[in-house]
Amino acid sequence: MRWGFMKVAFLIFSYFHKNQPNMPVMMHTLLFANELKEKGDEVKIILEGEAVLWAKDLLSENHPLKSHFEKVKDDFVVCEACASMFNVKEEIKGKLKLENDLFGHVSLKKYLDGGYRIIEL
């Protein structure tokens, strides 16, 4: 491990703002995650609640953030229970990592115990 190495998990709950996708939230998440990853840090982007809708959007071929998403695609973690509730589980299964360690949801303790700093955007 190099000096100054960080492990950061971005926790996203929101999707809608004024009945539309809140693009600034995801754009900044991808911007920050890519910066950290390019500098050798470890990142995760955790989607919980309505934020699981981002998974479906970002996987579409014509999404405006597609090029930024592709660089950190393997670092996404999607809540399985929420993906089921928002009817996107089957569309993202096998494309993004689904987790269900905490009664169907993502366990933040797992990431905290793994040395991650959690940042909610």
Swiss-Prot record:
Pfam families given in the database record: DsrE
Organism of origin: Methanocaldococcus jannaschii (strain ATCC 43067 / DSM 2661 / JAL-1 / JCM 10045 / NBRC 100440) (Methanococcus jannaschii)
InterPro entries per UniProt: DsrEFH-like, Sulphur_relay_DsrE/F-like
Name of the protein this chain belongs to: Uncharacterized protein MJ0733
Top-rank taxon, per record: Archaea
